[in-house]
Amino acid sequence: MLKTKVKVSAIENLSDARYCAGMGVEWLGFSMTEVPVDKFNEIRNWLSGIQIVGEAFNCSEDQIIALCEAYQPDVLEINSSVQLEKIKHLNCPKILRVNLDSDNLPALFAAARPYVDYFLLVGDSEDSLLGFEDQVEIWSAQYPIILGLS
């Protein structure tokens, strides 16, 4: 079993979902704009003890609300372009995907913290985290951080 909380993204089939669940993955992410709701529900019904994350990237706030009503994920993952005030009423934990290479992270962390449960740090390349180790440690002491690795 895993010793660290892990989120796997872009799950599209039951085989991958069951493998990840068997390994003890904490969160399984499904694109709510790419995986049909019936397939999403079919996969979800086979799983237990794992948090299902509905990924909604590059969607308007109204689209996110509609997707959450249709898919009813355990957790919602959005990117930093979303106006969090407009989706704060959604009754599920939120993961905000932030980019080390392009987002103003200190300001974003402070502004978004009242609205989100976790910050998922990603970058534009595999090397994005290089040189940020000390800063990530500082941020992790202040905010709930998940590291995104490719």
Task: Give each language-model segment a name.
Residues M1-S150:
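Conserved N-terminal beta1-alpha1 strand-loop-helix module at the mouth
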